[in-house]
From Swiss-Prot:
All residue ranges annotated as the Vitellogenin domain in the record: 24-819
Pfam families, per database record: Vitellogenin_N, VWD
Compartments, as annotated in UniProt: Secreted
One GO cellular component, as annotated: extracellular region
tRNA-binding found in the keyword field: no
Name under which the protein is recorded: Vitellogenin-2
Species the sequence originates in: Solenopsis invicta
């Protein structure tokens, strides 16, 4: 390249002859001494190394400038395994090093060059491949490109213009490790430098007329065109042909320094030294844990004329080409070397006239490669004794094109053969061949012995586990080298164990999981045979299939095809559990092998799977899609869920078109299923966000779509990192979107992303910060949908993602949790868990129905509420089938379990059966996680890094029933985990592995026995005795917990197959002398062995040191064991007693006159264990001064009586009083001996809330400033009475500044105007009440006694500081005022954002949004901002939707109703009872209008005389009537007038308060029922009803249906939506009960009004043709430039028309181009109808048309049908249940009882 520019600038001074070109002079012989060393060590801790060093003589004869002949002889090598104080660069011979002869052939070989660049090496055919690679490494050190033959054209090239000038350039150059970029630096040496480098210039007299140059070569391993590298478990990316680096775990640096004499055209290499360093730095470590160092030095000894020739005719004919310098592979299973011939090196800058030569050479190389491939294939086939029908003679084009492909066609196509991986130790450990070839070790017998040893050692009673898990790793790796016949031999060995014995079970578990984790073709065939033969089935088979994709080594096309055939077999499709895990496993296999190709070493070994996409789509994806369609045809929810999830796991774009008809409502699917489809698209969105993002966005924009689907879609859309403008649109839309659930997701997701620091979300986080101020300021409750993404500054866990979608209860119906860690793969979290459920209410009702018998329900009398629902003829909306799933996925395992109503019934029945008898549970399993990386080192020996992390889990549980109140049993568990990181190299010539690493073991053993007694009479008592189980064979000690970290170096014989911990050559790395100690505790002992704990450590520092040693980043030698001696085992029986009790404070309480000060004045308290007296004392203390309420007591006692006499007591009591507006708590703890107490802690606290402000009286709320007070007393010491005392007092109140703002604002005037209309309880007025009661100031004071130690004072101050920080995180500004006395600490905190109450809830951060002049940016409330405070004004009218109350409420005002869902309408009741709220039977197929007892609630109202209104509240069997009598309001309970005293009225049933009636300060009444979750406030005319979230979408009446959708509030009992409020209200009027007013006429009109359907989801074009991967057919007539657009999208030509016709034909075949009418007809199914009347159950004799699940009728017509009726009995009820489950019994032969007309659908459309 730049050599023409130099114009031979040294030619004038050179006196070389024409036969001297570059480094070699024809006819001469050069002799170099060779020294090499390779060492591995954990030198992060200590300079202790293991490895080899060798020497020899390399003689080179120059036959011509382009041909060299070489020979390496007199080779010797020595082992090094010791500490080198000066590090690996110390060239002084280490101590006690013994050299021995290296077993090399010493046969001469030829080297072909071109312009000094080595192009080919030819060796004798009998020379082993490992020797070839070592010689390539040595000879490669003499390759030097002084003329830029391979230089890369760039601006940084520095060309030498004179012999005194340096040269710098980059070249792409071969070496044994690969073809990578090399930085050349050529510098002339000065006289002083020559003097300093005399050892590097052994023959300075050569070229005496020339110069000496230093040539430095620095290799860049991140820019390689070719690498010989195998990896597994790493996601290595490559851009085009450029190597993009191995991973963060491995980094490599290579520097070569060469001294030459002469000029840059003709010179002699005096010496060369290469230093290579491989650093191992896992992501869990801050710095490299160790390194592998390689040093190779060549020094010129002689230069003479050629004395004799090495080659005769026979030797020449036996030479074969081995290609360029890059590492050569061979077939490890072949009896011969059968080398893979590499291509020749072609100079990058050769002249054009040489192009034909290069082409010819390349062609010859390709031909040789093809020949070798064929030979290798046949050899591999012959080496196996088994055959496969999968074999094929067809050639792979990818293999022919890429000579790097090391897999033979037989190994790729025949899954009965072991894979060919010639870089892993067990594949090349015996002279470059698999260790199975060795006659020194019977590997099969050794594998059998390993299985037996592991089976014995995994017994819970076994002792050591340090080596067990490593033995399992060895077994797993051995299995990878075996074929199917050898697997079968091992299987027969395992089956010879005694059937039913523990040894048989353990041996089977070991072999089964080792086969699973081997991950090869023969391993798969073995598992397939187990499943087909029934040897494994059910949950066991499902586990094997679910883990298989995580462990497969080479997912070849034949492997995937075989797995595909398996999942289609009846043994899989018809088997429980397996038919779920199998398709999901196939999907994961497709994702990893076709989409995650970087997971496998395709850039070194070629594409393992097919590159084309046709087979994936045409065969596998289509199969999954067809199964999904079949699931809908069968109405099989479990199958539908399974294949939705499986399709999503593939992350293939084809799934968009599969989900399209369901997401667009063209085909019926339930809301739950469509939500699951959107979630399934999230995996594809991570791979192709620009493709899937717009689909999510369009689903979100459709406000007629279900909120679950929209919430899921918008959350996933935000995570696709959309453009800023779109994110702004979403944020702003939260102020207008009517769905609070969707808005809550947007707000929570954006707010959490604002604080994330994860690199992958950096751009998204910046966008979230920019749009956060556009988001609504509404504060949404915990029950709303949400999305949270958190960061963790931890070495292991990086982040946490949480997504919830709200449902019909407080519990979300969809929850997803993802944990990101260093083990993330393919953008997937390391751990995923979650569940989905269509309806919690249905779920729990189904469980309750199956768990408790309801046989007596049909006979008992119906309640008042049930009769009301029947009288109104409330018809439950037909609900979707109950369906749901559980999900768990990790690097170890995955599980997806879908269920429906039938599975819940089966699960409940199985659980009941299990709990009612003596049963055993037992299970064990190995789990596997590993990373592997191996590549050719610069010395020609394979470098290997492995991370193996097997885990073994075993559990045994025995249950023994001892009657209804007692049981006993045993529980044994064992968890063993080993994490071993090893790195080093393999010396193939001696089957030795030199490795360093860190071995980390963790073992947990829990063998216990227990006895349980419980009594649930008055107080609930629970007594537990638990003791260690004295296991046999445990000796004198029981090791409960073991933790060890052992850094080590070793030299290991690969044929010994021993764990490193058992190898005699293994040497732990000690950084200092090891200190051993044992610390005795009462119940256990701790043994510690470490090199980082000193003898001088005291007890306190010792514990801290032990905790420090367990830090995952500490790699020092450590062993910690927690043990029980035989004496401790006998004495370690623990006794635990727990008691729970409740006390109701009611009308008989005589403590009302005592003050609250006495609450904490217990001067003495019963201190003995399980003291009934103590519980009574605490209960009495909590109830003092309380008018009514409930007290809860929880008491725990713990002792180990045989070990020590001390016992421990913990008692907690809590009290809540609605009448007193108080919360109290009492905490007591002590340690005591049998006769005296040793230490006591007493803590009491009380929260006194401000008097309850009525929501119906703004005047009172404005006049009375709120103030909540808090007091706590802490006492501790020998006794509470004599010990230290700390008093904490606090209050939350409304500051004077805020009070002035409210009173001087327009708020009061606006409210008075509302009052003039007679409506005091409409929305704005109630919110004004809440604003008037805001708190914005907290006062905290600590009073300390004189004897309180200084540490307690520091803690008190820290509490204040923490409170400030917490408040600051929530609020914008905090003002602090501190006043300290000697024993008093006072603080006042002033909030910028007021709160509604002192502790429980915070209002939105930007409460300033509701004001017209409240600035949120104050830093303090000092004098400088006083004027700003004075200018603040509140204007509630400007902010009707900003303030959210703590609980949703419904209000009946003078002539208006304000519903739960914020719908306001006029109403006139008249003297006619109207139902404001009532529950109703939720089950559409309810057999008798049954309503659960705790949901039997109804509230009615009617106008009365004197401009008043009567209200009726029904709670179960209780009836409360609220009416106005004169100027007072009165309560009538069950027909009896009751007097409401200052402590209220309580209705107590047993020991439970059913409800309370309280008098409020403005004389209105409040009815509170915590049992039923209802609160009603009544003032004689108006009523405000608050209901818990349990009533969402579960009520009807004038208050609406409480489903968060205002447009569905006017729903009638018959599920029709009306538009006129007066007609809607009349449908809930009790017109049959002496009704006076407009209701009867309005009800008649309502019956004649048009019945509008519920607003269902409309069809919408969510997915375009392009997104679905189809030919564009949309928008043909849209726009003014159709021609250009058609041209752009391939339309408007004959080819397009033909494609379009073909597409339509294909669509018609698949049913996707059906007409709209056809689709509507397909949505019709035929079902038997059930009619219940009186004591009869009737069935239609023939099935009638009905809409498919998820569809709704678009047109109906009347149809007469015959009925067959049966008496109501068990037989008819069972038949009814069968029909409801989908059965269509044949009643055509039954007698017709009567006829009835039904409205049946003509057509149905998707909901």
């Amino acid at each position: 390249m730049w050599f023409p520019v130099t114009l031979l600038f040294l030619a004038g001074v050179a006196v070389a002859t024409n036969n001297h070109e570059h480094a070699w002079e024809t006819g001469n012989e050069y002799q170099y001494s060779v020294f090499g060393r390779t060492l591995a060590g954990v030198d992060k801790l200590k300079r202790q190394y293991t490895g080899i060093q060798y020497n020899g003589i390399l003689t080179i004869q120059v036959k011509s400038p382009e041909l060299l002949q070489a020979k390496f002889d007199n080779q010797h090598y020595a082992h090094i395994h010791q500490e080198l104080s000066n590090g690996p660069d110390d060239f002084d011979d280490p101590k006690n090093v013994n050299y021995k002869r290296m077993p090399m052939s010493e046969k001469p070989f030829e080297i072909k060059l071109k312009h000094g660049i080595i192009r080919d090496l030819l060796f004798d055919r009998d020379v082993p491949t490992w020797e070839v690679n070592m010689m390539k490494a040595i000879v490669g050190q003499l390759q030097v490109d002084t003329q830029g033959e391979n230089a890369i054209n760039s601006k940084s090239i520095q060309v030498p213009s004179d012999e005194s000038f340096a040269a710098t350039f980059k070249a792409m150059e071969d070496s044994v490790s690969g073809k990578c970029e090399v930085l050349y630096e050529i510098t002339p040496l000065t006289v002083n430098e020559i003097q300093a480098k005399q050892d590097r210039i052994p023959m300075p007299s050569l070229h005496s007329d020339g110069n000496h140059y230093e040539v430095k070569k620095l290799k860049n391993y991140e820019r390689c065109q070719e690498r010989q590298l195998y990896h597994y478990g790493f996601d290595i990316k490559s851009a085009g042909k450029k190597w993009a680096g191995q991973d963060k775990v491995i980094s490599q640096l290579s520097v070569t320094e060469m001294v030459i004499s002469g000029d840059l055209k003709r010179f002699t290499i005096q010496s060369t030294e290469m230093k290579n360093e491989i650093a191992v730095q896992p992501e869990t470590s801050d710095s490299p844990i160790g390194n592998v160092y390689t040093i190779t030095r060549l020094t010129l000894k002689k230069k003479n004329s050629i004395s004799n020739s090495w080659f005769g005719p026979h030797e020449i004919s036996n030479l074969e080409s081995t290609g360029n310098l890059v590492y050569t592979f061979n077939n490890p299973f072949s009896d011969s070397d059968n080398r893979r011939v590499r291509h020749h090196s072609v100079s990058q800058n050769s002249e054009q006239e040489n192009s034909s030569e290069s082409s010819k050479s390349s062609s010859q190389s390709s031909s040789s490669s093809s020949s070798a491939s064929s030979s290798s294939s046949s050899s591999s086939s012959s080496s196996s004794s088994s055959s496969s029908s999968s074999s094929s003679s067809s050639s792979s084009s990818s293999e022919e094109e890429n000579e790097n492909v090391v897999q033979t066609k037989a190994a790729l196509q025949n899954i009965f053969l072991a894979p060919n991986i010639p870089l892993l130790p067990y594949f090349i450990g015996y002279k470059g061949k698999t260790i199975l070839k060795s006659d020194k070790q019977n590997v099969m017998q050794f594998a059998k012995n390993l299985i037996s040893e592991i089976a014995e050692e995994v017994q819970i009673t076994s002792e050591g586990y340090e080596a067990t898990m490593e033995k399992y790793t060895i077994l797993k790796k051995l299995l990878r080298t075996m074929n199917r016949k050898q697997y079968a031999e091992l299987e027969q060995y395992v089956l010879q164990f005694n059937k039913g014995s523990d040894s048989r079970a353990n041996a089977w578990t070991t072999f089964r999981d080792a086969v699973l984790h081997a991950g090869t073709g023969p391993a798969y065939v073995t598992i397939e045979n187990w499943i087909k033969s029934g040897q494994v089935k059910g949950a066991e088979a499902a586990r094997l299939l679910s883990q298989l994709p995580k462990n497969v080594y080479l997912p070849t096309p034949n492997y995937v095809q075989a797995f595909f055939e398996l999942i289609k077999s009846p043994m899989v499709t018809q088997q429980e559990y397996v038919n779920v895990s199998a398709p999901i496993a196939l999907a994961e296999l497709l994702r990893n092998s076709y989409i995650g190709q970087n997971y496998y070493p395709i850039y070194s070994f070629g594409f393992i799977t097919l590159k084309k996409n046709d087979e994936v789509v045409g065969k596998y994806i289509n199969y999954l899609a067809n199964q999904l369609q079949q699931g809908y045809q069968e109405n099989n929810s479990r199958k539908i869920q399974t294949y939705i999830f499986a399709l999503g796991v593939t992350a293939h774009p084809k799934i968009i078109s599969v989900f399209e008809p369901y997401l667009e409502h063209s085909l019926p699917a339930s809301t739950y299923q469509r939500t699951l489809m959107v979630a399934a698209l999230s995996d594809l969105a991570k791979v192709q966000p620009k493709l899937v993002g717009p689909i999510f966005y369009k689903l979100y924009l459709n406000e007629n779509e279900a909120h679950e689907v929209r919430a899921m879609a918008v959350h996933e859309f935000i995570l696709t990192d959309p453009p800023m403008i779109t994110l702004q649109r979403i944020a702003k839309n939260t102020n207008y979107d009517t769905s609070k659930q969707v808005n809550a997701v947007v707000k929570s997701t954006l707010e959490s992303l604002v604080h994330t620091k994860r690199s992958e979300w950096r751009h998204l986080a910046n966008k979230a910060r920019n749009v956060r101020y556009l988001v609504t300021s509404n504060n949404y409750g915990n029950w709303h949908s949400s999305g949270y993404h958190l960061d963790f500054q931890d070495w292991l866990v990086n982040g946490l993602s949480l997504q919830t979608i709200a449902g019909d209860d407080l519990i979300p119906k969809y929850v997803y949790v993802g944990v990101n860690s260093v083990f993330d793969f393919l953008d997937q979290p390391s751990v995923e868990a979650g569940y989905g459920l269509s309806s919690h209410r249905q779920f729990f009702n189904e469980i309750s129905k199956q768990w408790y018998s309801h046989q007596a329900d049909d006979e008992r009398r119906r309640s008042r509420v049930e009769k009301l629902a029947q009288a109104l003829q409330i018809k439950a909306k037909e609900q979707n089938n109950l369906e749901g799933h559980f999900l768990f996925n990790s690097v170890y395992d995955s599980a997806f379990y879908p269920y429906d109503r039938h599975r819940i019934r089966e699960a409940v029945a199985a659980l009941k059966q299990f709990l009612n008898g003596n049963n055993k549970l037992e299970g064990s399993a190995f789990n596997n996680y590993e990373n592997i990386m191996s590549f050719a080192n610069e010395d020609g020996l394979p470098f290997v890094y492995t991370l193996d992390a097997p885990t073994f889990t075993k559990a045994k549980v025995n249950f023994k029933q001892g009657g209804r109140t007692a049981n006993s049993g045993t529980f044994q568990a064992l968890i063993a985990n080993n994490v071993q990181q090893q790195f080093g190299f393999v010396a193939l010539f001696e089957h030795q592995k030199y490795i360093a690493g860190i071995n980390n073991n963790r073992v947990l053993r829990v063998p216990v026995e227990y006895d349980v007694e419980f009594n649930s009479n008055n107080a609930k008592n629970f007594a537990l005795k638990i003791r260690p189980q004295n296991l046999p064979r445990m000796g004198n000690e029981l090791k409960l917990l073991h933790y060890s970290v052992v850094p080590f170096t070793t030299q290991q014989d690969l044929l010994d197959l021993k764990p490193t911990s058992n190898d005699k050559n293994t040497r732990p790395v000690f950084t200092s002398p090891v200190y051993k100690t044992t610390v005795q505790k009462d119940t256990f002992s701790i043994k510690v062995e470490s090199d980082s704990i000193g003898k001088e450590s005291d007890t306190e520092s010792f514990v801290a040191d032990v905790l420090r040693l367990t830090n995952a980043n500490d790699d020092h030698y450590t062993k910690i064991s927690t043990i029980l001696t035989s004496d401790q085992i006998q004495k370690s029986e623990g006794h635990i007693t727990m008691t729970y009790d409740t006390v109701t404070i009611g009308g008989n309480n005589d403590n009302s006159g005592q003050s609250s000060e006495e609450m904490e004045s217990l001067h003495s308290i019963s201190w003995k264990s399980n003291s009934k007296e103590r519980r009574k004392q605490i209960a009495n203390n909590l109830s003092k001064g309380i008018k009514s309420g409930e007290v809860y007591i929880f008491d725990v006692s713990y002792s180990v009586p045989m070990l020590h006499e001390n016992e421990y007591v913990f008692t907690f009591g809590g009290m809540k009083s609605n009448s007193n507006q108080k919360l109290r708590g009492y905490f007591y703890w002590n340690s005591h001996a049998p006769q005296e107490v040793n230490y006591e802690v007493c803590f009491s606290h009380e929260m006194q809330y401000a008097p309850r402000a009525t929501p119906l009286n703004f005047k009172y709320a404005l006049k009375n400033s709120p103030r909540d007070e808090y007091k706590a007393v802490l006492k501790y010491g020998k006794t509470c009475a004599t010990g230290n005392k700390v008093v904490i007092t606090g209050s939350s109140s409304q500051s004077q500044q805020l009070r002035d703002i409210i009173e001087n604002s327009s708020l009061p005037n606006n409210v008075w105007k509302r009052f003039q209309t007679g409506n005091k309880a409409v929305e704005n007025c109630m919110k004004a009440n809440d604003i008037a009661q805001m708190r914005d100031q907290i006062d905290v004071q600590f009073d300390l006694s004189n004897i309180v130690p200084e540490s307690v004072r520091r803690y008190a101050k820290k509490i204040i500081e923490y409170l400030e920080k917490y408040v600051y995180k929530v609020c914008d500004n905090v003002s602090r005022e501190e006043e300290s006395e000697e024993n008093t600490i006072k603080n006042t905190l002033l909030f910028a954002s007021p709160v509604n109450r002192m502790w429980p809830n915070w209002l939105p951060q930007s409460v300033s949004d509701i004001t017209s002049g409240w600035s949120p940016s104050f830093n303090s409330f000092g004098p400088s901002s006083e004027s700003q405070w004075q200018t603040m004004r509140l204007n509630v009218a400007d902010y009707p939707d900003e303030f959210e109350s703590e609980k949703q409420s419904c209000t009946l005002d003078k002539d208006k109703v304000y519903t739960f869902d914020n719908q306001l309408y006029n109403v006139h009741l008249g003297k006619c009872k109207h139902v404001l709220l009532t529950t109703y039977p939720q089950d559409f197929h309810n057999r008798r209008n049954y309503i659960p007892e705790n949901s039997k609630v109804a509230i009615l109202a009617e106008d009365a005389d004197n401009d008043s209104r009567n209200v009726y509240i029904w709670l179960g069997k209780q009836e409360i009537k609220l009416k106005k009598a004169g100027n007072n309001v009165q309560a009538v309970v069950n027909g009896q007038n009751v007097e409401i005293s200052d402590k209220g009225y309580q209705k107590i049933n047993g020991n439970e308060i059913t409800f309370e009636i309280l008098s409020l300060p403005d004389d209105s009444l409040s009815v509170v029922s915590e049992k039923y979750g209802i609160n009603a406030v009544y003032d004689g005319k108006r009523v405000v009803i608050s209901a818990s979230d349990a009533y969402r979408n579960a009520v009807r009446g004038l208050c609406g249906n409480f489903d968060s959708r205002p447009n569905t509030d006017f729903v009638t009992p018959k599920n029709c939506l009306l538009t006129k409020p007066e007609e809607f209200a009349a449908t809930y009027a009790m017109t049959q009960e002496n009704c006076q007013g407009p209701a009867p006429e309005n009800k008649r009109r309502a019956e004649q009004s048009t019945c509008h359907e519920f607003p269902e989801n409309e069809q919408m074009n969510v997915i375009s043709d392009r997104e679905a991967g189809r030919m564009m057919t949309e928008g043909v007539n849209w726009g003014y430039h159709q021609a250009n657009r058609n041209k752009e999208h391939g339309r408007g030509n004959k080819s397009h028309q033909n494609n379009k016709k073909q597409y339509q034909a294909n669509s018609q075949e698949s049913g996707s181009s059906e007409s709209r009418n056809d689709k509507k007809k397909h949505n019709i199914v035929y079902r038997t109808r059930v009619v219940e009347e009186g004591d009869e159950i009737c069935f239609t004799t023939t099935p009638l048309p009905a809409c498919r699940q998820g569809a709704r009728p678009t047109e109906r017509y009347p149809k007469k049908a015959d009925l067959y009726c049966m008496p109501r009995n068990d037989q008819s009820l069972d038949l009814k249940r069968r029909v409801e489950d989908g059965a269509n019994p044949d009643f055509t032969r039954k007698s017709v009882s009567r006829m009835q007309v039904f409205q049946v659908p003509v057509s149905c459309s998707a909901a």
